[in-house]
Every structure is written in structure tokens, then in C-alpha cells.
Amino acid sequence: MAEISSSLEDYIEAVYSIYTKDNKVKAIDVARRLNVSRASVTEALQKLEQFGLINYGHYGTISVTEEGVKKAKEVIKKHETLSEFFENI
């Protein structure tokens, strides 16, 4: 599985989280969740698509690939572990 930047990790985690709750994701949803501009989201989504983690449709629909699900779960686990570590310091 390809290594992605910590910034892209935040994006795949957000996309996956929205997808599992609503079964549909739009760029504006990701922008609101991460409090970033739509332009930043578009750039990140294009990169995630290049890595094969999402499918980014012409009409703004986003779906998570199998690889994307694996990566998102890996990122969530990593973030939970870090959070637990810092809570116990």
C-alpha cells in the first residue's frame, strides 16, 4: 500500500467517515469537515484518486475503493493509537 502524506491521511479519513455515515460524499462535505477550501479538497481528492484510494466522479461524487477502505482503517487506527498515547502521558 502506498505511503501518503499526513495531510492526505486526514482527507482519506474524512472521506471514509462521511461515506460510512451517509453512503455519499461530495467535496463540500469534506471541506466543511476539515474546515478547508474547496480548492484544497479538489487537489487532495485528485491525489487520492491517483493513489487508487477513491473514485472521484465528474459530478462531484466520491466513492472509496477497497484500497481506500484499507488505508482509511489503517489511518484511523494510527490516529487512535496516537490519541491514546498522548492521553496517557
Task: Tell where the protein language model's regions lie, with residue ranges.
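Amphipathic alpha-helical dimerization/coiled-coil segments
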Residues: E80-I89
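Canonical helix-turn-helix DNA-binding module
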Residues: A27-H58, E66
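N-terminal helix-turn-helix DNA-binding core of bacterial DNA-binding proteins
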Residues: A2-V36
